[in-house]
């Protein structure tokens, strides 16, 4: 998490983006823009811009690295898996095979106020690929 916060992957504007969405977490002050280039149902490019806490930046960085090259349907499934993981009971085991490196965020569920930080980029990504026009807010 610290590495992705200090050296975020896919940070910056995305040339030729086909959709973008803004996300804001007023409780923590996280403010992100997710940019995607979708080609024939595949995420050909994905990046993010903005500022926020270490958890939101690291989550956005890992999300973009994980989703680049994936089918949109796979991205939607990963969103559901990630969201279920961070919302699950602390004692519930984590399926590392499904989530890969994103499983490092399992500990966030012990801190309910931080769940919104971890999921902000994911909600913005899901909103962008579904075509919603409104900015995403965690409130």
Predicted features by range, described:
Residues 57-58, 77:
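Alpha-helical macromolecular-interaction surfaces
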Residues 7, 11-46, 50:
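Structured beta-strand/loop patches that form or line metal/cofactor-binding pockets in enzymes
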Residues 59-71:
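Alpha-helical support elements that line or immediately flank enzyme active sites
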Residues 1-15, 70-139:
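C-terminal binding/interaction regions
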Residues 50-57:
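Short, thiol/selenol-centered motifs that function as redox-active sites or metal-ligating centers
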Residues 28, 55, 110-114:
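Secondary-structure capping and boundary motifs in well-ordered enzyme cores
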Residues 32, 61, 116, 120:
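Active-site phosphate/pyrophosphate-handling residues
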């Amino acid at each position: 998490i610290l590495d992705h916060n200090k050296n975020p992957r896919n940070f910056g504007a995305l040339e030729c983006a086909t959709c973008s969405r803004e996300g804001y977490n007023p409780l923590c002050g996280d403010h992100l823009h997710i940019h995607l280039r979708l080609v024939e149902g595949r995420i050909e490019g994905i990046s993010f811009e903005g500022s926020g806490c270490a958890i939101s930046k690291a989550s956005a960085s890992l999300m973009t690295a994980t989703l680049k090259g994936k089918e949109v349907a796979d991205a939607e499934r990963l969103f559901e898996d990630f969201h279920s993981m961070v919302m699950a009971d602390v004692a519930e085991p984590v399926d590392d095979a499904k989530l890969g490196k994103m499983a490092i965020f399992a500990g966030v569920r012990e801190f309910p106020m931080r769940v919104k930080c971890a999921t902000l980029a994911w909600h913005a990504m899901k909103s962008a690929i579904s075509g919603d026009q409104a900015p995403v807010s965690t409130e």
